[in-house]
A protein has these predicted regions:
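Accessory carbohydrate-binding/adhesion or oligomerization-edge regions at the termini
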Residues: 438-525, 551-553, 584, 618-647
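Active-site neighborhood of glycoside hydrolase catalytic domains
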Residues: 246-323, 327-336
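Flexible, acidic glycine-rich loops studded with aromatic residues
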Residues: 328-464
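Short beta-strands within extracellular/lumenal beta-sheet-rich domains
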Residues: 522-536, 604-608
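Acidic, contiguous N-terminal accessory segments
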Residues: 20-140, 311-312, 435-442, 449, ...
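Beta-strand-rich ligand-recognition modules
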Residues: 557-559, 563-640
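A short beta-strand element within beta-rich, extracytoplasmic domains
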Residues: 538-562
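Feature activates predominantly on carbohydrate-active enzymes
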Residues: 93-279, 386-388, 595-597, 619
Length: 647
């Protein structure tokens, strides 16, 4: 590895991030944006010109933006003007969510076909740089590639407070996501008050977060909160699966005649209690169908109540009128002749992703192998499924990259495009794809600093971590076997298998049949090594994220043994010194869905302190693997590592 070149690239990255202005850091980046070199001076305030048809919510949002930058609102019409107008046509825009945003010497001019577009234009304006009450001149034409841009919250398994939900809704709105998929019924609990059957939400009927549920008033408050932010509230009543809480209370199977009667009562009460809701997800997945008439009958009943229905695919026997939410299988195209409507959620479960991998895979995603909305595909839903219990709700935001994932997904689904297939690691640094990701990473890191300083945001800059992968060495099934490279890691006589960039490197993905790792034809009973060098201006101890088998938050995975990083005998050496694994709180604990993770993942424990010397520091990661089967399906073999400075 060329030390001078590495250091030069590192300096370039640091310089470019520090000099990236908010003006260039819009997320999602608009479809068409043209900057001018000049600026508009707002130090003397602005005059407002607002159409009477503009909603009060948008007017208040505009006032909040101006007040946030201490820009006064003036009655004098001779100064700069900010105008909000709904127009019948707009060049380059054919979506109600699209907009035109122009800043010139006369002021700020926003036009849209509907109030949604005004709202999204203001979200773009909110991210503009108003330093010293000056803003750059720009001309924007923007609209989404997909009209359905969703985020799923699973509060059935792990309850979240109203304030926590509103925090996430606010982030959704700021990044132009427009559907909240609200999963509130589960095996562990039914979390919505029923006036007809109040015992359904009793503490004794819940196996986790006992008694925690949403009252009718709170549920309505969520609906209203979403509506005010142009977010469709999509509740899910999962039927007939994930219904153990229902069955504990009613003492019948949901698919039985009596069970159907009870669920219809609840559905009728739901429709009468929340008459403004017109969309309902009816579930249908992960259940043995004993009554083939259940789903057709329930679907027709739900539709008779005035709802458009959504269901999981694969799942039960859905009706043709039900929108299919795809969640299993590889990156396949939709059959254009199927005559059905789809949403994509395949490999969009962040609970199965490493935090750094989350941003990587979502940035490059092409939804259902399409670059934009089609007649059969209206969009996608990013899902957060914390199946495993958590000690406190905040843990969900550190164990999974909720906010980094949300805004990366928002970028991709608004802009469209992406690349065919799925990836878990970064492309080569000479490629255009890498440079596109690096540019986005600069934007997301600026947003982390500017907008998420007080919120959990498990992401670190990874485009400056350069690795040589060396191997494979045949370990003959002995994962502790040592090879010469451990004594002389930076000798010139080793064959470099591949140069790889990234903070998390997945050698072989545990879903290798659909997601490639960085090793093209991985072999069992192999050992690879990853080597790198890191510069330090002085001798000091610095924090690092170090990890190996990133445990899914949906499996009952076992905790590593004391003294081991993982079950593969992976090791880390810095300047020839072995870095010990953390002292685990629950070493060797057999996994269980009711046993919360505590420190097993690098993103939700204290960073590992590593002693660095002045100058270049040698990093060597040992990565042995035996077979690829894993102990069982709860403990798949995860041949991977994370090593990255923590800032």
């Amino acid at each position: 590895m060329n030390r001078i070149a590495h250091f030069f690239l590192l300096l370039i990255n640091l310089f470019s991030v520090s000099n990236l202005s908010s003006q260039e850091a819009l997320i999602p980046m608009p479809q068409d944006i043209q900057w001018s070199g000049n600026k508009l001076d707002l130090s003397k305030g602005m005059h407002l010109e607002i159409d009477k048809s503009i909603r009060k919510n948008e007017v208040n949002l505009l006032r909040d933006i101006l007040e946030g930058h201490s820009i006064n609102i003036q009655k004098d019409k001779r100064g700069p003007t900010i105008s909000l107008k709904i127009v019948s046509s707009l060049n380059g825009v054919d979506s109600e969510e699209g907009y035109g945003l122009k800043i010139d010497a006369k002021g700020i001019h926003i036009q849209a076909l509907a109030s949604k577009g005004i709202f999204y234009a203001l979200q773009t304006l909110r991210q503009m740089d108003f330093h010293e009450k000056q803003v750059a001149l720009v001309n924007i034409r923007d609209q989404p590639a997909y009209s359905f841009r969703g985020f799923l919250l699973d509060v059935g398994r792990n309850y979240q407070s109203l304030s926590m939900l509103k925090e996430q809704i606010d982030v959704m709105a700021k990044y132009k996501l427009n559907v909240l998929h609200f999963h509130f019924t589960e095996d562990v609990a039914w979390r919505l008050e029923s006036k007809k059957y109040p015992g359904l939400t009793a503490a004794e009927n819940m196996t986790r977060w006992a008694g925690e549920h949403y009252s009718v008033a709170e549920f309505q408050e969520l609906i209203d909160y979403c509506r005010d932010r142009h977010i469709l509230f999509l509740p899910e009543i999962d039927m007939p699966g994930h219904s153990a809480a229902f069955e504990r209370f009613f003492k019948v199977n949901m698919q039985s005649e009596e069970g159907i009667g009870h669920i219809k009562e609840l559905l009728k009460e739901f429709s009468e209690t929340y008459p403004t809701l017109k969309h309902l997800h009816i579930g249908g997945d992960e259940v043995k169908i004993s009554n083939k008439q259940f789903m057709p009958e329930i679907t027709k009943y739900v539709e008779s109540l005035g709802f458009k229905t959504y269901g999981w695919d694969p799942g039960s026997n859905l009706e043709s009128t039900t929108v299919r939410q795809m969640w299993m299988g590889g990156p396949n195209s939709i059959d254009p002749n199927a005559g059905l409507q789809y949403l994509d959620s395949k490999h969009l479960y962040i609970n199965h992703m490493d935090p750094l991998e989350t941003v990587t895979t979502l940035f490059f995603r092409r939804f259902a192998e399409q670059e934009k909305e089609s007649e059969r595909l209206s969009g996608a839903i990013l899902c957060s499924w914390p199946d495993r219990a958590v000690e406190k709700p905040e843990d969900m935001f550190l164990q999974s990259a909720v906010y980094p994932g949300m805004i990366t997904f928002a970028e991709r689904i608004w802009r469209g495009g992406g690349e065919s297939g799925w990836r878990a690691s970064l492309p080569g640094r000479e490629t255009e794809a890498f440079h596109e990701f690096a540019a986005f990473e600069k934007r997301i890191l600026l947003h982390k600093t500017k907008y998420f300083a007080d919120l959990p945001f498990p992401y670190q800059r990874q485009t400056e971590m350069f690795w040589d992968l060396i191997g494979p060495y045949d370990n003959a099934g002995d994962l502790t076997k040592e090879f010469l490279i451990e004594k002389d890691p930076f000798g010139d006589h080793y064959h470099v298998y591949k140069n790889q960039v990234g903070g998390t490197i997945i050698l072989r993905h545990w879903w290798a049949d659909i997601i490639p790792g960085v090793i093209e034809s991985p072999k069992q009973n192999s050992t690879f090594y990853a080597r790198s060098r890191i510069w330090s201006d002085k001798t000091e101890e610095k924090p690092f994220w170090i990890g190996f088998a990133n445990l899914s938050r949906s499996y009952a995975s076992d905790s590593p043994a004391q003294g081991a990083w993982d079950e593969l005998h992976s090791q880390v050496f810095v300047n020839g010194q072995k870095i010990p694994a953390p002292k685990w709180k629950h070493p060797g604990q057999k996994g269980g869905l009711e046993l919360p993770l505590s420190d097993e993942g690098y993103s939700f424990r204290e960073p590992t302190k590593v002693q660095l010397k002045e100058g270049w520091n040698d990093i060597l990661i040992k990565l042995p693997v035996g077979d690829f089967k894993g102990k069982d399906w709860q403990n798949p073999t995860k041949w991977m590592f994370t090593f990255i400075p923590y800032h």
